[in-house]
Design a protein with these regions (language model features):
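A short catalytic or substrate-binding loop motif that flags glycine-/basic-rich loops and adjacent residues
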Residues: 12, 455, 708
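Short amphipathic alpha-helical segments
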Residues: 14-16, 172, 662-664, 710-712
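A carboxyl-terminal module marker
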Residues: 685-710, 749
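Generic structural motif
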Residues: 118, 412, 479, 511, ...
Length: 756
């Protein structure tokens, strides 16, 4: 009797063992999907990991069905799953859920997309027979028109002789009805007469149009060519290379040349981007060159589309290039040769909730090593960890310090809004300098971007009389006003509340919004510039793939000229006519209780500033702050990444933070705050007995209650070189001991490794 270990798509650690019935031996191999029972009535699609003869001590159920003829998961993918589960301390079931499209985990069989086609019956496929068919319908005018339309579309009308030729074109039923302006009943009448018949064809959901045109790749500038050569030299010595290039230096063109080289060597390429918005712009550039060799993969695609991409990657003709967001790292590759991680510093590469809380950059580097492939990290503002690795010689380093075609870096003008408010010179959140710059840009047919890293209308509402602030009943946060839907919304659990008309505390009707979100910015700027064509880019306006594409296309083509947005607008988007960028509130990024606050603030401001001044003209950035003397403000103005790096590095060394130490956040959750407090103290005491002063806490996080669950956080700081396996064994053991305590039956403990 053979047995198979499987992963179930449930938040359960480890594998489960099933017996393999005699009739399935040979079909059950690692990587195939199996239908297995669990409990009395549940059935799941499990992933086979290991086939063996080791009879378990318990009675195990048999596999019910093998769903694949060939594996849906390649060996390297399985190893990546196992690494993610181990390193990020996540159940393998959670990794399975994150990795595979829903259609491959569902017990309902995936249905390929079908199209109904119309064809001429074999009886009427000669010139003489066609005349007979036309005579049959000559008095039924709609049928006659539909038949002649079909003959024209399919090219049957241009045939002579009795033998059909290669020139016959397939015609869909929908196309025929649209062209002949007929109903389905008319087509049915022709079918009933035996003149036409219909058949189904699998057409797929993927765009397969477009040949590759590698000859369209633009030649590199001298600076780009030097960087390209430098990357190839470094890749001869290092597995990972960091390309540190200023904004608008033409990094994407270098990537395209590297992709071409990989394709010519018959290798596949994985190109990761942090935001779906970015894939829209870069997709157009890559598609012009690589055509249907390019596949796109991200969460805004339908589940069926993602299944088809997955299956194509397993076929004999996979995509040469995959462009995608974080989840694309899980796709199958048969011959991966190059991984490109653009904007490698971006925090959106890190999955937060649910588990696995993996970092796509780290996972992609590990995946590349499994294939013997090379990894290129590209950014204008490297993460501290990547730059440190490059400085230490772990990664190769190539720098590109000039903008493409000599475009100057933007002029950054710092505006002290505290002084302007005192002199009553501010118009809401807008300084006179910013309004003047936007006015000038619009007058000259240019575009402007306003950056405010807070969506909604107002971050909170408050009673002007007693100071009452409405809070979420499920979470420990104030509610955000969304004026367009006239609701208060919790950005943590999604719960919505009606806007109160009077204060429940004092009865006052003076309830006002406080602060500025992107929605309020949009309202106020529209009053100041009524002639402007304004668009807003935030989570609320980009929930669908089409919404992203429409926003970016409208701004690229000049149908809108003023873009207001959150951090989405900072991420590598390339707009030719943007001459002004306004950073409305730099302080909101700096005054954050996190050791990475300055690093993230610098990156955000440097990146959004880089959107200004693209072709032929130096851009202008208006940076509004109450603290113009903050060192990081000067570093942004002078584009002084090195100064930021050196300043922060010493602090990190002193206070035991990355890149010198690894962090693991241990979270404890429970419905009752008292139980959560007690359990977290008990857990931290156990951890302190092993790790000593490396353990901090427990403390309440910034938001200590989410979705009715109370939270405590324990931080463990681990020096580089510590035995990672021992650390994980200790943590798992402590968690198991807590699980055995009857007081903590409903307690949740989970981990965030290398938190951002």
């Amino acid at each position: 009797m053979k047995y198979v270990d499987v992963i179930l798509p449930l938040p359960l650690d480890g594998t489960f063992t099933y017996s393999v019935p005699d009739g399935m031996e040979g079909k059950v191999v690692p990587g195939v999907r199996l239908l297995v029972p669990l409990g009395k009535s549940k059935k799941y699609i499990a992933m086979a990991t290991r086939l063996h003869d080791d009879k378990p001590a318990f009675s195990c159920k048999p596999v019910e069905a093998v769903l694949d003829n060939t594996p849906s998961l390649l060996p390297q993918q399985m190893r990546l799953w196992q690494w993610i589960g181990y390193y990020y301390m996540a159940p393998l079931g959670d990794v399975y859920n994150a990795a595979m499209p829903g259609g491959l985990k569902s017990t309902e069989k995936f249905k390929p997309k079908m199209e109904l086609y119309v064809e001429l019956a074999s009886t009427y496929r000669s010139e003489q027979a066609l005349h007979v068919a036309l005579n049959l319908v000559q008095r039924a005018l709609k049928q006659a028109k539909t038949l002649t339309t079909f003959l024209r579309l399919s090219h049957w009308d241009s045939l002579d002789g009795d033998t059909p030729r290669e020139g016959i074109k397939k015609v869909t039923k929908e196309e025929l009805m649209n062209e002949s302006h007929c109903t389905a009943a008319v087509v049915k009448a022709l079918i009933d007469r035996g003149i036409l018949f219909t058949y189904e064809l699998e057409i797929g959901r993927l765009n397969t149009n477009g040949e590759s045109h590698l000859d369209l790749i633009k030649p590199l500038s001298l600076a780009q060519q030097d960087a390209y050569n430098g990357i190839l030299m470094q890749m001869m010595k290092k597995d990972v290379v960091l390309l540190h290039g200023v904004t608008s230096s033409g990094k994407t063109e270098i990537y395209i040349h590297l992709i071409r080289k990989a394709i010519e060597e018959h290798k596949q390429v994985l190109y990761l981007l942090p935001e779906i918005a970015l894939t829209v712009q870069i997709m157009e550039r890559l598609h012009r060159v690589f055509g249907d060799r390019l596949g796109i993969y991200h969460s805004k695609y339908s589940d069926a589309e993602r299944v088809e991409i997955w299956q194509k990657q397993l076929s004999d003709h996979p995509y040469d290039v995959i462009l995608g967001a974080r989840s694309a790292v899980f796709l199958p590759f048969k011959n991966l040769g190059l991984v490109i991680i653009d904007e490698e510093h971006e925090t959106s590469f890190k999955q937060q909730d649910p588990a696995p809380r993996y970092h796509a950059r780290s996972a992609a580097i590990v995946l590349a090593k499994m294939y013997g492939a090379k990894t290129l990290l590209g950014t204008a503002t490297p993460s501290m960890e990547s730059y440190y690795n490059a400085q230490q010689g772990k990664y190769g380093l190539v720098e590109l310090k000039t903008r493409y075609k000599g475009i100057q870096l933007p002029e950054i003008q710092v505006v002290d809004v505290k002084d302007l408010r005192r002199r009553k010179m501010m118009s809401g959140p807008f300084s006179p300098q910013l309004l003047a710059a936007v006015r000038e840009a619009l007058k000259n047919g240019q575009q402007a971007i306003l950056f405010q890293n807070r969506r909604g209308f107002a971050p909170m509402v408050e009673c002007k009389v007693c100071g009452w602030v409405p809070k979420c009943k499920n979470c420990d946060v104030s509610l955000t006003l969304h004026k367009s839907i006239n609701l208060l919304t919790c950005h943590y659990c999604g719960y919505t509340y009606p806007v109160p008309t009077e204060c429940p505390n004092c009865g006052s009707t003076e309830i006002m919004g406080r602060g500025f979100g992107t929605e309020k910015i949009e309202d106020q700027i529209a009053e100041i510039f009524p002639e402007a064509k304004i668009a807003r880019m935030d989570l609320d306006t980009t929930r669908t793939r089409n919404a992203y594409e429409r926003l970016i296309a409208d701004f690229s083509e000049g149908r809108t000229n003023l873009l207001i947005g959150t951090q989405m607008v900072s991420k590598g988007l390339d707009f030719d006519k943007v001459s002004v960028v306004g950073i409305l509130n730099a302080d909101s990024m700096l005054n954050y209780p996190d050791f990475r606050a300055y690093e993230h603030a610098f990156m955000m401001m440097a990146q959004v500033s880089g959107r200004a001044g693209r072709k032929g003209k130096r851009g202008l950035v208006i940076l509004q702050t109450k603290n113009p003397t903050f060192p990081v403000i000067g570093q942004v103005v002078n584009n002084d990444y090195e100064g930021l790096y050196q300043g922060i590095l010493e602090e990190r060394r002193t206070f035991h933070y990355p890149p010198f130490f690894h962090l693991i956040n241990v979270y404890v959750k429970h419905k009752y705050d008292k139980v959560c407090e007690q359990a977290s103290h008990e857990l931290s005491k156990t951890l302190r007995s092993w790790f000593g002063e490396r353990v901090l806490g427990p403390d309440k996080p910034a938001v200590a209650r989410v979705k009715t669950m109370n939270i405590r956080k324990i931080v463990i700081k681990l020096e580089n070189g510590i035995d990672q396996q021992k650390v994980r064994e200790y943590l798992k053991f402590a968690q198991q001991q807590m699980g055995k305590d009857p007081r903590y039956g409903a307690l949740q403990i989970y981990y965030d490794v290398d938190p951002l």
